[in-house]
Design a protein with these regions (language model features):
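ABC ATP-binding cassette signature C-motif
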Residues: 1-196
């Protein structure tokens, strides 16, 4: 990528789109400091706390209870503006009813484990959330809850997804990866970009 500069603003919700192999995941890894750029740099502020939901997911101790998995991370999640939500309430918000919270992880379906993984990312109270293909394995109801959460999220968010409908609901502009190190900053959502 040549001559590309970008400064993320607080509360910004950005979508990243592009064909496979155009560098989206590499860009995310460089932003998070997992991969060094060949040239140039990423300056990340001292107060930035990344929350990263990846396609690879997270391995859980299958013998733990759902509530314990999340409670081992934090007793509450910081929602911004001085608002906090306890573990049980937060799990309930993400569709784990109180009785389900005391189930063992091994009893969860694949979709429920993905939802639990999402909760573990969010419980770390990130102020810069990166959702890399998060919509692939989440059901419609969970996506609706995530959509609401992102609308109220008091930090930056990057969403990498092929789900146009979800992107239209949660992002205010796009970075379009067009291949050959070409990135376009587009001020609008996915549908607006396609019509442009």
């Amino acid at each position: 990528v040549e001559d590309f500069n970008y400064i993320f603003a607080r509360y910004e919700k950005m979508g990243i789109v592009g064909n496979n192999g155009t560098g989206k995941s590499t860009f995310i890894k460089m932003l998070m400091g997992e991969v060094e750029p060949d040239s140039g740099r990423f300056d990340v502020g001292e107060t930035v706390r990344f929350g990263y939901y990846s396609q690879d997911g997270l391995q859980f101790d299958e013998q733990m209870k759902v509530i314990d998995v999340v409670q081992n991370i934090a007793e509450y999640v910081d929602l911004g503006d001085g608002k906090k939500m306890g573990v049980s309430q937060f799990l309930n918000y993400f569709l784990f009813a109180p009785e389900k919270q005391h189930n063992y992880v091994y009893k969860l379906s694949g979709g429920e484990k993905r939802r639990l993984y999402l909760c573990t990312v969010l419980m770390r109270s990130p102020n810069f959330l990166v959702l890399d293909e998060s919509t692939n394995d989440l059901d419609i109801v969970t996506l609706n809850v995530l959509e609401e959460y992102l609308r109220n999220f008091k930090g930056c968010a990057i969403v990498v997804s092929h789900d146009r409908y979800f992107m239209d609901k949660v992002v205010d502009h796009l970075l379009v990866f067009r291949g050959n190190a070409d990135i376009k900053d587009f001020p609008g959502n996915y549908t607006q970009y396609r019509e442009w």
